[in-house]
C-alpha cells in the first residue's frame, strides 16, 4: 500500500516527514516545526497545533476556530522562502513562508514571517495573535529566565 505524501510539500511520504513529529518526535529545526504545523492544519491535528505553540500561549488559542478553519479548507501548498536561526539562549529562529488554501470564500495565500523559540530540546511557535498580559520587564514566558523584552518579546508583544 502506498503511503500518502506529506502535505508540507517535501514530496516525501507523510510517515517519513511530518508524521513522525505529529507522533511525538521533536522537530529538529524551526523550519521542520513550521512545515509540520502546516501539515497539521491540512490533516486537522488541532492538538498538535496547540502543543507546538509556546506553552504560555496555549490557553489563549481559539481551538474551535482553528478546527473550523482546518476542516473547512482545502490546503493547496506551502512554500518556505527563508529559514534563519538567530541564536541566543534560548535559541530563536524565523521562518518566512507562503501558505495556500481554498475555502468557501475562494482561494487564499498568506505570507508570514513567524518566530520560534527552542526550549528543552523542542521548538515552539510564538503566536503573535495570542496576547500575554506581561510587561516588557517581566520574565519571559518561554521559561528561559530572562526579561521578555530581551527574549521572545519582539515576537509576541
From Swiss-Prot:
It comes from the Bacteria. InterPro entries: NTF2-like_dom_sf, SEC_C_motif, UPF0225, YchJ-like_M. Disulfide bonds: none annotated. Belongs to the UPF0225 family. This is UPF0225 protein PA14_50900. It comes from Pseudomonas aeruginosa (strain UCBPP-PA14).
